[in-house]
């Protein structure tokens, strides 16, 4: 199943590239960003210049989006070593400006109450690392939010071996926590008539009881079963978390009874119990951003209406 998940990730990457090429038309500056997959020392200097240009909005908002799109495309072209260097550059060079922050804090401490009101905005600005603006530019691009979710998944994987990346990961988590507020998510039922792409992802993302085959999946989506997932408006066909439910009369002795493909269908008109036998977080990059309890509450409400 891990191999299938990796294949889906690569398929997603191939979809991003044309999207991002569309917002990166031919431009003299864009032609200069050509990076070795390992991101060598010379490339690092070019990359820093490029990131600076993104942050300064040279040429206006459209040009900044074009640069951010090209930056994202080049990140996807890097190998593991190159991505570590890319992320380390962001972490090291675009953190909070400690000198400016110290100056603002000293001004705030020396100010009277009325002056502090005006300095609060300066303090908030000084606490915001420049890389937050760059991450936000990625989010504004087609498939950008999925790009950032997967970037955080990489940061979570890398931060133990590369502790310098921890602050960047924390910044990205803060952004994603706001963008994935439960009020923005949409609950949808998944059934056997859902798209093949979505069903394929259920197989890949199931984290509790592995789905062994398409027949196994079909059994879990039969008339006496329910499957619900949360989706983000900017990540269609990408479940964030999903729950599998069995509608039965009484209680099952064990989960194997629920997964038995040879078991007869339950008459749902007689069902008096909903067994939530599996809940899976589908996006590693959203780890620590909890909406499982809210999904369960929504599903319970939906089933009560049935």
Task: Give, region by region, the residue ranges found by the protein language model.
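Extended, composition-driven regions rather than compact fold-specific motifs
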Residues: 1-306
